[in-house]
From Swiss-Prot:
It is an enzyme of class 6 (ligase). Residues 350-417 form the S4 RNA-binding domain. Its main location: cytoplasm. HAMAP family: Tyr_tRNA_synth_type1 (MF_02006). It is found in: Cytoplasm. This is Tyrosine--tRNA ligase. ATP binds at K239. It comes from Rhizobium meliloti (strain 1021) (Ensifer meliloti). Pfam families: SYY_C-terminal, tRNA-synt_1b.
């Protein structure tokens, strides 16, 4: 559909969120005439979501901002199975205790983007364990399982890929798409939910839910998927050279999060402003026209706006100021990430390679050695070329810390304790 008339779909379309819908015209009409309830599922595979999942949270944010009701569905039940979609092998099964702990940790992020409550447009957080854990297997087979064609399930790309590669697909995993389809019907029965959204890799699972709803007598249900994003150079969103870009502040602080977005490739800046900030389109269009050295200022705007939504405006501005002092003034910014080292250990002397690994700037002594040999390591802004260098209490500055740097963009403070 060339142009949506409903606020929600128009907003998503102009900002680049829409990859595919099950019925452009029907869904647009639904949003123009009703307050729509829609959901996205989040499986608790880790204690935090990472930046790759932020596009889904932003879709829920815009749903509520345009007057509709979002549901963030926690996969307490489906997480016990694991989504096999486009995976080369089965996920390692998690214990119920791990799943519960991950959900408790994950859900803290959502209130930064959504308003939860009891009102008709307030967001809901629901756990599919509420209905999946109590299912009677024989009744489920009779009432739900009979509506699924194995022939059709085998035709979905996510399944076909595993089979064509002769990679094992367990019966447990094969059931995941049935459970996800059932979630859609159950959410309609409980909340009147008519739309499921997700990444484009979820298309088959979502369409299964629409078909199941049709066979079980629900009104027309709908699907909307977003593109699977990569950076301009082909890297996965939410991954950096240092690892996953976590959303939970106890797993990645505001400064490191800000830096991830500040380091966005030039070709991605305009696209990311549309997807990950709430800046008006007119302002985004203005910023997108800037080039040359001004693109770096636009990247700072991007980093600050994205960080402000997750960590709050004060933390975002503090991260920006820390970066400014570090990179533009060369000053020692007290809000840089830090690692604590026992003072007696420093007094005895700590090997540089060991410190680089402990600080998370290298994964191994071998990698640390390559960084030193490549001239990338500095202590208190002085380049270090000797991999046998020992760091001691004499390296502690008047500020009571040691500044450890890797390249131009990674800095942290070593604090004796």
């Amino acid at each position: 559909m060339s142009e949506f008339k409903s606020d929600f779909l128009h907003t998503l379309s102009e900002r680049g969120f829409i990859h595919q819908t099950s019925d452009d015209a029907g869904l647009d009409q639904l949003f123009r005439t009703e307050t729509v309830t829609a959901y996205i599922g989040f499986d608790p595979t880790a204690a935090s979501l990472h930046a790759g999942g932020l596009i889904q949270i932003m879709m829920l944010h815009w749903l509520q901002a345009t007057g509709h009701r979002p549901i963030s569905l926690m996969g307490g039940g489906t997480g016990m199975v694991g989504d096999p979609s486009f995976k080369d092998e089965a996920r390692q099964l998690m214990t119920p205790e791990t799943i519960a702990a991950n959900i408790a940790s994950i859900k803290t992020v959502f209130s930064n983007y959504l308003r939860y409550g009891d009102g008709p447009k307030d967001a809901l957080m629901i756990n599919n364990a509420d209905w999946l854990l109590g299912i009677n297997y024989l009744e489920f087979l009779r009432d739900v399982g009979r509506h699924f064609s194995v022939n059709r399930m085998l035709s979905f790309d996510s399944v076909k890929m595993r089979l064509e590669r002769e990679q094992s697909l367990s019966f447990l995993e094969f059931n995941y798409m049935i459970l996800q389809a059932y979630d859609f019907v159950e959410l309609y029965e409980r909340t009147g939910c008519r739309l499921q959204m997700g990444g484009s890799d979820q298309w088959g699972n979502i369409v299964n839910g629409i078909d199941l709803g049709h066979r079980m007598g629900t009104p027309q249900l709908y699907a909307l998927t977003s593109p699977l994003l990569t950076t301009a150079s082909g890297a996965k969103m939410g991954k950096s050279l240092s690892g996953a870009v976590w959303l939970n502040p106890d797993m990645l602080g505001p400064y490191e999060f800000w830096q991830y977005w500040r380091n966005t490739e030039d070709a991605d800046v305009a696209r990311f402003l549309k997807l990950y900030t709430t800046l008006p389109m007119a302002e985004i269009n203005r910023l997108s026209k800037l080039g040359g050295s001004e693109i770096n200022e636009v990247k700072k705007v991007l980093a600050t706006e994205v960080t402000a939504m997750l960590h709050g405006r004060a933390a975002a501005e503090q991260a920006a100021e820390t970066a400014r002092k570090t990179f533009e003034e060369g000053a020692l910014a007290e809000n840089l990430p830090s690692v604590e080292v026992p003072a007696p250990e420093l007094e005895s002397g700590l090997g540089l390679l060991t410190l680089l690994v402990r600080a998370g700037l290298a994964a191994s002594n071998g990698e640390a050695r390559r960084h030193v040999q490549g001239g990338a390591v500095r202590i208190n802004d002085d380049q270090v070329s000797d991999e046998r260098r020992v760091i001691g209490s004499g390296d502690v500055t008047g500020d009571g810390v040691i500044k450890l740097s890797l390249g131009k963009k990674k800095h942290l403070l070593v604090r004796p304790v």
